[in-house]
Each structure stands twice: as structure tokens, then as C-alpha cells.
From Swiss-Prot:
One of its GO terms (molecular function) is ATP binding. This is Actin, cytoskeletal 3. The keyword Electron transport does not apply. Actins are highly conserved proteins that are involved in various types of cell motility and are ubiquitously expressed in all eukaryotic cells. It comes from the Eukaryota. It holds the Pfam family Actin. It is found in: Cytoplasm; Cytoplasm, Cytoskeleton. One of its GO terms (cellular component) is cytoplasm. It comes from Lytechinus pictus (Painted sea urchin). It catalyses: ATP + H2O = ADP + phosphate + H(+).
Amino acid sequence: AEREIVRNIKEKLCYVALDFEQEMQTAASSSSLEKSYELPDGQVITIGNERFRCPEALFQPSFLGMESAGIHETCYNSIMKCDVDIRKFLYANTVLSGGSTMFPGIADRMQKEITAFAPPTMKVKIIAPPERKYSVWIGGSILASLSTFQQMWISKQEYDESGPSIVHRKCF
């Protein structure tokens, strides 16, 4: 039951700040960002900077004690591992998918962060389809049903022998 309450708070009240430090300053100096939430027992709690501090862990995993890159940096690193000839298409067609991308503000923040990493003249476009909560599952099921999909499979041995270039060779 507690997990459901937290999930409900996350889905109804949380958002990704475009500028985390600025948002922290705003939250510290005024109550404009605070929202009330009624618990099942009728108790009313106030949610303040937690509204954007929790999703910030997607961009700064160190908030959770993790030593890993945020989603923006992981996305950039993935693009940089691809063949140089297709990078501009990846920058211009980055699609958000999955439940954790449903936070309001996440597309604008990804746009800002990836633009900061990308070459200055690069066009960066983040696409956030409204149905993205289930798009991972839907896309996977469509891909698995294609008759041509099996020829795109890559074994660990193939990847170990060829590295990331095997993906480009087999899938494009």
C-alpha cells in the first residue's frame, strides 16, 4: 500500500526541473512549488522540493549513491559509440520511452543536456510521444514479430569479436 501511495505521488506531483539549482533556490525562498497531498487516512502532507529532487536522480545518480552517468550522458555516450555517419540522425531523432520518461519537463531537460554535449552546429531533437509509457513493450513486440528480425540478432561472441560496429552492419 505504501508503494502505491509513493507511486501515486510520483505520477501526480513530480516533475523534472529544467535548471535544478535554480529550482532549488526557488523552493528555498518561496512556497510556490509546494503541493498538498491527501493520504488514504485523511492526513494532508506538503510535498516541496521533493517534487523535482526525486526525478533529478535520473540526471544525477550520485544523489542515490550510484557512480554512473545520468540518462542524458548515457544517451550521448550511446550516440558517440555509433558510426560517425549516423550520429546526426540519432541526435535529431532521440525518442523517450518507458514509464520513467513520463515526468513533465523531462523532454526539455534532455534537449538542454544533450545539446550541451553535442557539437555546436548539431540539430538535437528529443521526441516524447504521449504513449511512451508502454512504447518499449509495444516496440519490442512489433520488432519480435517481424520476419526480418532474426537476421539482426547479435550473439555475445559476434559482439566480442566485432565490437559495436556489428550493430551497424547487421541492423542498418
